[in-house]
Structure formats: structure tokens, C-alpha cells
Amino acid sequence: MEGQDDYQLLYEGRRSQPAAPPEEEEVSTLPRGRRQRGVEAGEGSAGREESRGHRRSQHRDRSAGGSMGSNVIGLPGVNPPTSEVVVMEPRSFDEMAQVIQYLRERKTVIMNLTLMDPAEAQRSVDFVAGGTYAIDGHQERIGENIFLFTPSTVMVSTPSSQVVQPLQRPLQSPTPLWPSTYEHLQAVGQH
């Protein structure tokens, strides 16, 4: 039990330490702002030992708290990355360079090509699809002349991998509500 108490005292910095090196050497290892305050305030080695012990006990209290991430400090002004979706309705092929730039900036792009000439729209889709492939992105047709292009950080998935096919029934003419003419004539002739 005594060994544990000695360890506790040593850990908290209360046990007698070997003679401190000359004050000039110790002060020179401190950051400039702290060095000036310590010398001006007239702190001796006892004050430094006390503050070290205080820091050690704070560290022990934090680590004994049980949460591993309790000592993580967020950087002020740094926000977590957010995803951005850009909706474009280009009118010419010249705007495709901007689409590629958005993808390089890891932004998702939805392109509505209904305003473009069909031949130029096909050329535009081919161009952006090539750029998307080059950056390991993904592409998906989501409607008539509407396409989704995503960077490699975004995965595109559909609820089911099978394409839903409409039910195909053989074409039948509906059953008439009135009797056919032939049957009607037979029934009238028998009366």
C-alpha cells in the first residue's frame, strides 16, 4: 500500500524532486510569453512544481473520466464539410467546363438538358460522363434529358436493382355490356 501512496505522490508532483537546473535554463525552454510572466512575477521553482502537479492532476482527472474523446478540442471557425448539390440547366456546350469544375470540387450536379439541342445535349452528356469517369465519380439518368453526376465521395444507389417492368397482359377486347348482334338476332328470331 505504501508503494501505491509513493506513486500517487510522485505522480501528482508532491514528492521531493532532484535539484532543479539553474533557472535560466528552465526559463529558456518555456515559450516567450510564459517566460516573461514567470520571471516578472518572481515565481521560483516551487511555483513551477506546483503548477506541474496541478496540470498532471487535471490530466489524470480527464483520463479517469472514462470518455476517450473528452480531450478533443474543436477548431474555431472550422465547420464540418457539407455536401452541395448544383442544379444546372445549360443552354450550350460551353457550360460543361463549369460542370466538371463542380465535380472536381466534390459537388453533386444535376443537369437538366431540356433547353439544349438534342445533338448538343448528347455531346454534353458524353463529355461530362468522361470527366466523371476520370475522377471515379458516378452518373445516373434520372429522367428524360435529366442526369445526375456525383464525385467519388457520393455513392448513387436505387432502392432495388431490378428495373420495374409494367405487367404485360395479352390484349383482349372488353366484354360488351350488350349481347352481340349475332346472338341478338338469333334470340329475336326464336320468339
Curated annotation (Swiss-Prot):
Keyword Cell cycle on entry: yes
Keywords: Cell cycle, Cell division, Cytoplasm, Septation
Record-linked Gene3D superfamilies: SepF-like protein
Compartments in which it is found: Cytoplasm
Superkingdom of this protein's organism: Bacteria
GO biological process terms on file: division septum assembly; FtsZ-dependent cytokinesis
Subunit annotation: Homodimer. Interacts with FtsZ.
Name the UniProt record assigns to this protein: Cell division protein SepF
Source organism: Synechococcus sp. (strain JA-2-3B'a(2-13))
Gene: sepF
